[in-house]
């Protein structure tokens, strides 16, 4: 018999390489074929619920790394909750209406303006449904477990019907109204935009200081050769000027410059003088802003007057303290105009071109008017200074073109009547990170009314009729009738039926004596679509629950979905749609740049999956602090792949060395485990407790860090490091070996369960090698936290031993550097411990020689010799061990040959072989 055959060498078919791109897809098919999502929910029926409501991504193109971060994060949470006993369904959603779909059709040469509206919308629907299927395939391939057969999609008939009911409730309560006011207007997409559809970019702009001649100063200042100085960054709005706004609390200086006088805010005088170039000026008078109200100036270009008004939005941050006010082109301007009954003059059309209301500018694009105004003011002698500067300006988030403020007639949702209720609901909700609460609170506190109408084709139509005299018709009966039609036919019914067919049978109105009605042409803002999903999905679907326990999206959704959902939910039910909000940062490259094709830094999840596997992306998510921006690059993903390899190889070692272990037959009770095995069991138990607590806080970064640290330090660098001397060398059924196998097997089971939400494919593969009752690890529950009575005592003593071990490893390294030894098993170590360390060693009563992986260990209770290395907890002498290397245990021993039956082996190995392989004692051994 060969010596090798007497060793208990580990064996496993669990491969070192995961072959993830191939194996993952096989697992996903198996999960789907065996209905694992449904099986898990069935196991948890009647248990406490956990409802994560999926914020719907827009259905357009393949998924990007931001999608992957979001969906994997949700999947980790839902998988954990299900394995921890919660009934945690997950219904994925898609946002499908809106401009991007129309843009894609335009690229194909389809013109919505020349096509029947219903047919055009059908093409939009087809495109959106194709995109949903494309993204669904991508999400499934990330290993996301969900109710893929029953997703919610904002174009579904029932969803659209319920959205109409949400609108109807808000209308009934008086929150919806029609009005004319300035809104974000995208000339590039010919529609209004919500705040959430606007992004800011730095652009160069003309800023001008303009002199408005004073014509009526109420007798307070001399109007002769006196000018109000305004500053604006939008010269193109000068034709629409109706007023000059001052802050009633500020002081204003009348400044003599040559033979002219100028009025500016006292607090900005020095800055303005420097900007314009007034070298020699003198303050001749100071007046209060409050006293300037109702003064008048002459428009420098047009035959009209400009009224001086008050406004607390006027600041001393920039400009002159006198604000050019055009009620048709700005929110603050509009509010001032309402107070003073000024005209809402907005002579720019949907394409950003001036109308015939300013004849000489008719047909000119507003940006061209910008340059023209500078020239005209210069020619009129009214331009005091032109300066080109860079500032942050709103752009359409889809077309990337600048937007303008433009007063148009729109439908609005007023939040003022229930703003306090919303703020109270924000206070009641929990936010991760905690600053999210303040951010959303301030947004709601400061936000104006929500413009909910859009001048587009692809969306849910505003369910409003108009009577013959133009009166809007919206009643509970008309709303429910339309909702029921949409439930059956979808919102395209609005375009395939006449107004009469869409109204309840026999409907009449005093405003339509002839019984004629027309339909509203505008559609609802897409944020109203997704913002009503709490009702169309969580409230109305069987098996789901409202309010949701968690909303999890990117931090841009504080002004998007978190915001719109909150408004509609509180408006209709009085409560927030979520109990908790978790926001994540954006995915950037490793240099902190946004991903873009022009920079060439785009990483596609599908490409990564083909090269490395979805598990590597999932591990990247688990390793990242997602509450702030998250970096990704091929280098970073390579680091995740290295972490994966470390985890996989550790599991391979554990599986190989427990392949002959059956927990029912060979398991050792905790009280019978060796001290070092109990210590590892306690460390494992503490890890379980820490990981469950971190999962409960949705902190899977901590889960991964704790597990990786345990695998790297507690297992690989310590327990499994000295395990070979037990697992390979000791008798197959010896207490020492079975004790250690008990712990290793337990660690494999518990680590597999805890890692399943993060690495489901790999953990499912590992589960197949464990002797556990559940067919799939996803059908198993998270490990329970045990209570060990000797927990504190063992942790303290073994903690002290680990400090001593550090000393020994240091001494061994020094001996290696001095060429005294090569490997640690060549060493004979003598320890002279301090009093506390000696007491610890006596208490633990363990095989420290084995644990330290040395051939000989002597502990001396006495004074250390001169040649001892003085370290933190002991003095240590390292020498080369005397004797020969035992070919079986590889230790240097002086007792080789003492057993005449097996003269090749040391006494320990000879005894083990005689017990386990009696035939070897008779026949002898060979190398």
From Swiss-Prot:
GO molecular function ontology, one term from the record: aminoacyl-tRNA deacylase activity
EC number: 6.1.1.5
Reactions the enzyme catalyzes: tRNA(Ile) + L-isoleucine + ATP = L-isoleucyl-tRNA(Ile) + AMP + diphosphate
Residue window of motif 'KMSKS' region: 594-598
GO cellular component entries: cytosol
Principal location class: cytoplasm
Pfam families, A to Z: Anticodon_1, tRNA-synt_1, zf-FPG_IleRS
Keyword Hydrolase: no
Binding site for L-isoleucyl-5'-AMP: 553
UniProt subcellular location: Cytoplasm
CDD domains: Anticodon_Ia_Ile_BEm, IleRS_core
Keywords: Aminoacyl-tRNA synthetase, ATP-binding, Cytoplasm, Ligase, Metal-binding, Nucleotide-binding, Protein biosynthesis, Zinc
Motif ('HIGH' region): 57-67
Binding site for ATP: 597
Free-text note regarding domains: IleRS has two distinct active sites: one for aminoacylation and one for editing. The misactivated valine is translocated from the active site to the editing site, which sterically excludes the correctly activated isoleucine. The single editing site contains two valyl binding pockets, one specific for each substrate (Val-AMP or Val-tRNA(Ile)).
Description of how the protein assembles with itself and partners: Monomer.
Family that this chain belongs to: Belongs to the class-I aminoacyl-tRNA synthetase family. IleS type 1 subfamily.
Protein role: Catalyzes the attachment of isoleucine to tRNA(Ile). As IleRS can inadvertently accommodate and process structurally similar amino acids such as valine, to avoid such errors it has two additional distinct tRNA(Ile)-dependent editing activities. One activity is designated as 'pretransfer' editing and involves the hydrolysis of activated Val-AMP. The other activity is designated 'posttransfer' editing and involves deacylation of mischarged Val-tRNA(Ile).
Protein name per Swiss-Prot or TrEMBL: Isoleucine--tRNA ligase
């Amino acid at each position: 018999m060969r010596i090798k055959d007497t060793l208990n060498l580990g064996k496993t078919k669990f491969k070192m390489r995961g072959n993830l791109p191939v194996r993952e897809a096989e697992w996903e098919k198996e999960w789907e074929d065996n209905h694992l999502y449904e099986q898990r929910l069935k196991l948890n029926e009647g248990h406490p619920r956990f409802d994560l409501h999926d914020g719907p991504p827009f259905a357009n193109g393949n998924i990007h790394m931001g999608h992957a971060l979001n969906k994997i994060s949700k999947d980790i949470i839902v998988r954990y909750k299900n394995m921890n006993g919660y009934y945690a369904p997950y219904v994925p959603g898609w946002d499908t209406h809106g401009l991007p779909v129309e843009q894609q059709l335009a690229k194909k040469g389809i013109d919505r303006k020349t096509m029947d509206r219903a047919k055009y919308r059908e093409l939009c629907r087809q495109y959106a449904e194709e995109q949903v299927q494309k993204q669904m395939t991508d999400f499934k391939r990330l290993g996301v477990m969900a109710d893929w057969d029953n997703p919610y999609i904002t174009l579904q008939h029932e969803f659209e019907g319920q959205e109409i009911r949400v609108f109807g409730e808000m209308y009934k309560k008086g929150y919806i109204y029609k009005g004319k006011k300035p809104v974000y207007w995208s000339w590039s997409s010919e529609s209004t935009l919500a705040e959430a559809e606007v992004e800011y970019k730095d652009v160069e702009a003309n800023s001008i200081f303009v002199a408005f001649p004073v014509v009526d100063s109420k007798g307070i200042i001399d109007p002769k050769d006196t000018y109000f100085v305004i500053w604006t960054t939008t010269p193109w709005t000068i034709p629409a000027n109706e007023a000059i706004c001052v802050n009633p609390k500020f002081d204003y200086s009348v400044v003599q410059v040559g033979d002219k006088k100028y009025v500016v805010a006292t607090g900005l005088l020095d800055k303005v003088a420097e900007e314009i170039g007034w070298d020699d000026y003198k303050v001749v008078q100071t007046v209060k802003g409050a006293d300037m109200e109702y003064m008048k100036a002459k428009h420098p270009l047009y035959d009209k007057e400009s009224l001086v008004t008050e406004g607390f939005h006027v600041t001393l941050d920039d400009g002159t303290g006198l604000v050019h006010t055009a009620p048709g082109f700005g929110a603050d301007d509009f509010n001032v105009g309402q107070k003073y009954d000024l005209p809402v003059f907005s002579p720019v059309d949907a394409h950003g071109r001036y109308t015939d209301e300013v004849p000489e500018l008719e047909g000119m694009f507003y940006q061209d008017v910008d340059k023209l105004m500078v020239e005209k003011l210069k020619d009129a002698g009214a331009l005091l200074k032109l300066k080109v500067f860079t500032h942050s300006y709103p752009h359409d988030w889809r077309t990337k073109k600048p937007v303008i403020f433009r007063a148009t007639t729109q439908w609005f949702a007023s939040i003022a009547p229930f703003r306090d209720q919303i703020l109270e609901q924000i206070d009641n909700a929990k936010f991760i990170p905690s600053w999210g609460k303040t951010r959303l609170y301030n947004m709601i506190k400061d936000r104006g009314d929500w413009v909910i109408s859009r001048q587009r084709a692809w969306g849910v139509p505003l369910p409003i009729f108009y009577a013959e005299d133009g009166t809007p018709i919206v009643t509970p009966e008309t709303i429910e009738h339309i909702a029921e039609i949409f439930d059956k036919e979808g919102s395209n019914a609005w375009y395939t039926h006449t107004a009469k067919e869409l109204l309840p049978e026999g409907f009449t109105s005093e405003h339509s004596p002839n019984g004629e009605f027309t339909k509203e042409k505008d559609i609802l803002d897409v944020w109203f679509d997704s913002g009503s999903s709490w009702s169309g999905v969580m409230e109305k679907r069987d098996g789901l629950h409202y309010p949701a326990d968690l909303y999890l999206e990117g931090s841009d959704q504080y002004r998007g979905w978190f915001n719109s959902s909150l408004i509609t939910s509180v408006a209709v039910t009085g409560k927030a749609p979520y109990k908790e909000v978790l926001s994540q940062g954006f995915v950037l490259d490793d240099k902190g740049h946004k991903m873009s094709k022009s920079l060439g830094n785009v990483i596609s999840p599908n490409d990564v999956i083909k090269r490395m596997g979805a598990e590597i992306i999932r591990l990247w998510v688990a390793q990242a602090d997602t509450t702030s921006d998250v970096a990704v690059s091929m280098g970073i993903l390579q680091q995740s792949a290295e972490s994966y390899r470390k985890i996989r190889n550790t599991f391979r070692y554990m599986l190989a060395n427990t392949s002959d272990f059956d927990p029912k037959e060979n398991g050792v009770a905790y009280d019978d485990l060796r001290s070092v095995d109990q210590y590892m069991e306690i460390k494992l138990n503490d890890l379980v407790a820490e990981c469950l607590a971190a999962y409960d806080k949705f902190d899977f970064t901590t889960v991964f860090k704790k597990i990786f640290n345990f695998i790297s330090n507690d297992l690989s660098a310590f327990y499994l490091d000295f395990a070979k001397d037990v697992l390979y060398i000791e008798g197959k059924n010896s207490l020492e070996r079975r004790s250690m196998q008990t712990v290793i097997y337990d660690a494999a089971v518990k680590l597999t369960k805890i890692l399943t939400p993060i690495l489901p494919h790999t953990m499912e593969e590992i589960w197949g090698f464990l002797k556990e009752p559940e067919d799939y690890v996803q059908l198993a529950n998270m490990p329970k936290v045990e209570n060990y009575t000797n927990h504190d005592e063992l942790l303290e003593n073994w903690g002290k031993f680990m400090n001593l071990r550090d000393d020994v490893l240091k001494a061994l390294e020094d001996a290696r550097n001095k060429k005294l030894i090569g490997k640690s098993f060549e060493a004979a170590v003598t320890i002279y411990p301090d009093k506390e360390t000696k007491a610890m060693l006596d208490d633990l009563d363990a095989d420290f020689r084995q644990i330290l992986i040395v051939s000989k260990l002597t502990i001396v209770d006495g004074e250390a010799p001169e040649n001892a290395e003085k370290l933190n907890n002991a003095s240590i002498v390292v020498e080369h061990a005397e004797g020969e290397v035992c070919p079986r245990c590889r230790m240097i021993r002086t007792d080789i040959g003492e057993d005449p039956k097996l003269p090749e082996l040391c006494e320990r190995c000879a005894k083990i072989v005689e017990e386990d392989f009696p035939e070897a004692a008779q026949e002898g051994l060979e190398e």
